[in-house]
């Protein structure tokens, strides 16, 4: 199986506070934004701070994913389309880059390159997608300094086209075949 950081999904502020005793990231589940009081917030994956931990009452109305922070040197963006697996490695040159590197996409601070996958890794992805009964998914992994791959999440509607096109991966052609056999 995959290495998975400790994770919980909760809308209980007390449970969330207890979980956040170690470096933790916070992810919205339903959408990347929420309303709290009279303000509207847009939230990428964010490292939990003392201020956020002290103000967790907003999660009562919308569960969140809390996940142990992985000190990463790269991210893997896996695009699964109808049995085919495309893997792009994303790195950044920004010192102290945000936990979520998506805002850096399309800038000179974010680089993508094809990542050579082992047959075992591809088989694990295919097995997971079969078990989840998904024909498409964008799957995120973090790579730590020891080279360990940490499974972060499966996005059944995640971003994929921009970076796969950028580095010459034929994911769009695979999607076309999937949708118009």
Regions found by a protein language model. Give the residues of each.
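Conserved N-proximal alpha/beta basic substrate-recognition cap immediately N-terminal to
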Residues: 1-6, 11-21
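Coil-to-beta-strand transition motifs
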Residues: 2, 73, 82-83, 134-136, ...
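Short, solvent-exposed secondary-structure boundary motifs
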Residues: 6, 67-70, 130-132
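Phosphate-binding site of ATP-dependent enzymes
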Residues: 16, 20-116
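C-terminal active-site "lid" helix and adjoining low-complexity regulatory extension at the edge
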Residues: 112-123, 127-134, 143-181
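Hydrophobic residue at the +6 position relative to the catalytic HRD Asp in the kinase catalytic loop
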Residues: 139-141
């Amino acid at each position: 199986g995959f290495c998975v950081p400790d994770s919980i999904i909760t809308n209980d502020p007390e449970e969330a506070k207890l979980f956040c005793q170690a470096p933790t990231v916070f992810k919205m589940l339903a959408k990347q934004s929420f309303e709290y009081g009279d303000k509207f917030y847009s939230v990428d994956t964010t490292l939990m701070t003392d201020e956020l931990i002290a103000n967790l009452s907003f999660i009562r109305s919308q569960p969140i994913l809390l996940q142990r922070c992985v000190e990463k040197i790269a991210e893997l963006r896996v695009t699964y389309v109808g049995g085919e697996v495309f893997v792009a490695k994303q790195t950044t040159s920004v010192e102290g880059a945000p936990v979520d590197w998506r805002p850096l996409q399309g800038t000179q601070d974010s680089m993508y390159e094809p990542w050579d996958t082992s047959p075992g890794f591809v088989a694990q992805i295919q097995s997971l997608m079969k078990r989840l009964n998904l024909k498409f998914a964008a799957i995120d992994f973090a790579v730590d300094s020891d080279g360990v791959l940490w499974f972060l999440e499966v996005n059944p509607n995640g971003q994929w086209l921009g970076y796969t096109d950028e580095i010459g991966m034929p994911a769009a052609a695979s999607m076309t075949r999937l949708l118009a056999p």
